[in-house]
A protein has these predicted regions:
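Active-site nucleophilic cysteine motif
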Residues: 53-65
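Bacterial N-terminal signal peptides
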Residues: 11-20
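N-terminal capping segments
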Residues: 30-51
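Short, contiguous acidic and Ser/Thr-rich linear segments
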Residues: 50-56, 127-128
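Short, structured protein-protein interaction patches enriched in aromatics and acidic/basic residues
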Residues: 70-99
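Bacterial N-terminal signal peptides that target proteins for export
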Residues: 2-10
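Feature captures the catalytic ectodomains and active-site-proximal regions of enzymes
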Residues: 21-26, 33, 41, 66-69, ...
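Ubiquitin system architectures
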Residues: 97-100, 104-107
């Protein structure tokens, strides 16, 4: 008995010794814009912050790349000892990527031991508009101190009213295609239409927190989808503190806590659509109780995109429907109003059971959004 126990103790001590003696790893990353490294210690600290991702026992490589400052990725290149440099298309493989605790990268069943990764980013200039620019623009337009937010003003000037029109999942590539397909009679007219970057992960909860606080995810505390409230001040909080009124017109439920008066718009007519009810509720607010700040959230492009795919006829129909609502809302608004229409993220096609569209990857279709500005 004692010999068996001693053998177990020796084996356990040996295992600890071997583990402790394993060299710490560092992943080297480089692009034309950045050269960074990500250490085993950083991995261990970041792993504590994130919930477990299905199929990835470590951390998604998307998370590592975002944390290291990389934004929109076309591909990565790694060195295969047997075949030389090999390139991986990020749109095709990015969602499968995983950095494991031993420093090994996997793409599903494919394993990569290279500790040097070249990141091919899609280049954007330093002055690219960002979703973080919405909060300072809204606050400045209403004459409220921006409190040293990192973003810039998209448009200067002060207004009696500001309206945010939230076009869920209407990414910039989809906006451009809708223009070519003549679906945008109204959303093509504003004088300021700009390409912009959202935040990672490109999902509604995370993007909502970023646009409402003007702070990036790890500063506002909302860096994954399970977090639905921020401790940071939002534009709703600051507008209320300034003695101004705000109202949010939402779909059938809230993706993120807004801390203001909320009007939910369920599918009252049972037509499988909440956007028509969002529109009618918004019109009622504008006519009877127009606040200083109005938030209008259309969910239909996102809902249809997940079900049928972002390039489907159903999404085209939804885009045309929301475009008509945009034109009618503009006509209804009082003078001296600033209107900002925007997407929280885009969407890419997938072939998964029960789903034909998804988002959350560091790719162009997900990360690049339109911001459309109009004044009245």
């Amino acid at each position: 008995m004692n010999n068996k126990l001693n053998n177990k103790v020796i084996w356990f001590i040996t295992l600890i010794f071997i583990t402790a003696c394993q060299p710490a790893w560092t992943l080297q990353l480089k692009s034309d814009r950045l050269t960074t490294s990500f250490s085993q210690k950083e991995f261990q600290e970041l792993k504590k912050e994130y919930s477990e991702t299905e199929g990835c026992p470590g951390l998604p490589l998307n998370v590592i790349l975002d944390k290291s400052g990389y934004e929109v990725i076309d591909s990565i290149i790694y060195n295969n000892l047997n075949r030389g440099d090999e390139e991986i298309n990020w749109q095709e493989k990015g969602e499968e990527s995983c950095l494991n605790k031993n420093g090994q990268i996997s793409f599903g069943s494919q394993k990569i031991d290279s500790k040097l990764i070249t990141v091919n980013e899609i280049p954007f200039g330093p002055d690219i508009t960002r979703i973080l620019d919405i909060a300072p623009t809204v606050l400045s337009a209403l004459g409220i101190d921006k409190e040293n937010l990192p973003g810039k003003n998209i448009l200067e000037g002060q207004f009696d009213h500001v309206v945010l029109i939230f076009l869920d999942a209407f990414g910039y590539s989809r906006y451009q295609q809708a223009l070519q397909d003549d679906l945008l009679e109204n959303l093509s007219k504003p004088s300021l239409i700009t390409m912009a970057l959202t935040v990672f992960p490109a999902r509604t909860t995370v993007a909502s927190a970023a646009l409402l606080t003007g702070l990036p995810p790890f500063e506002n505390g909302v860096y994954e989808t399970g977090i639905r409230k921020t401790e940071a001040d939002t534009i709703f909080d600051l507008i209320s503190e300034a003695g101004l009124a705000s109202i949010a017109v939402e779909g059938e439920s809230l993706a993120f806590s807004l801390n203001t008066e909320v009007i939910l718009s369920g599918d009252r007519d049972l037509n499988g659509n909440t956007d028509d009810n969002v529109f009618s509720n918004a019109e009622e607010v504008i006519k009877s109780n127009m606040p200083n700040f109005l938030w209008i959230h259309f969910h239909g492009i996102d809902n249809s995109g997940h079900t049928y795919g972002p390039d489907s006829k159903q999404v085209n129909d939804k885009i045309a429907e929301i475009d008509s609502y945009f034109g009618k809302i503009i006509d209804s608004l009082p003078d001296n109003t600033l209107i900002i229409a925007f997407a929280d993220h885009g969407m890419h096609s997938v072939n998964e059971e029960g789903r034909s569209g998804n988002h959350g990857n560091l790719i162009y279709d997900d990360m690049v959004i339109p911001i459309i500005v109009e004044t009245k």
